[in-house]
């Protein structure tokens, strides 16, 4: 193990001891905010420390096996060689896992998200596909035991959505779905196509970390314009006689958010403000990533919402993620919400890239 990694793991082990001492303090236990913060830190440190202690234990076993090689008995030597091979495999695996645990953490990974799905090129077929994608993410959310709540939607003229915005909440939502931002292309025969020709259309998805409170973004309410209007349905017809729909504009950035799905103007305003704050926060994050030039490339592509990231080919039952050249013939399964087959390889690709950078630094 590299000396700098060993030193870092020792620091984390010592920090865990400090946290345990603080958590046993009655004064800390009575401070809910501090107790919760320390409990979360302990939950993060514990698995890393367990792996580190296991590594140290196996390393001691390896040293014992080396001593056994000095014995005259050939059977003992054979046992020692076998033991060393087994222990080295375990050490290599643990070392890789420990290096992963020390990789830079995305501070937004624990956040909930705002997901926006917009129909792009392809007219009615794009609107229908946006509905298919929303159902796919809804089913994935259900499998993960997360919660999904529609904030705003605009119906297509012949089904589906021109746009749908939703909030997904739960444990580690952003960490799993952050790579879904980009252009999603579909190739299939529309139901209205009499000649059986395959059409290509697309939807754009934006995944934004949700702000926990508006103060995070520091929005000056004097810079915000609030407009109210009547909610509308498919084709633009008004479905509400009161001005319950709300559009909020952040004048300095030109960022706009609106909500009309809630029953009251008050709820729609609160939801629109949440989306507005999350959009501004996301813009700030993107600017930071541009300054850290290599970061976005490392995160499976540029993060550009216009970048085509995935193709869904229905005639072939094929789905391709262009960022990592991954092709799976499991389209129907994935559209049913079984997204792990495509999400996990993206996470592995990111970790592999980060490990390569770490190894370059250590070498």
Curated annotation (Swiss-Prot):
The keyword Cytoplasm applies. Residues 287-306 are annotated as: Disordered. Pfam families: PCRF, RF-1. Methylated by PrmC. Methylation increases the termination efficiency of RF1. The modification N5-methylglutamine is found at residue 237. InterPro entries: PCRF, Pep_chain_release_fac_I, Pep_chain_release_fac_I_sf, Prokaryotic/Mito_RF, RF-1. It comes from the Bacteria. Transmembrane segments: none annotated. It is found in: Cytoplasm. GO terms for molecular function: translation release factor activity, codon specific. Residues 287-299 have a biased composition (Basic and acidic residues). Its main location: cytoplasm. The keyword Cytoplasm applies. PANTHER family: LD18447P. Belongs to the prokaryotic/mitochondrial release factor family. Peptide chain release factor 1 directs the termination of translation in response to the peptide chain termination codons UAG and UAA. NCBIfam families: prfA, PRK00591.1. This is Peptide chain release factor 1. The lineage of its organism: Bacteria, Pseudomonadati, Pseudomonadota, Gammaproteobacteria, Candidatus Pseudothioglobaceae.
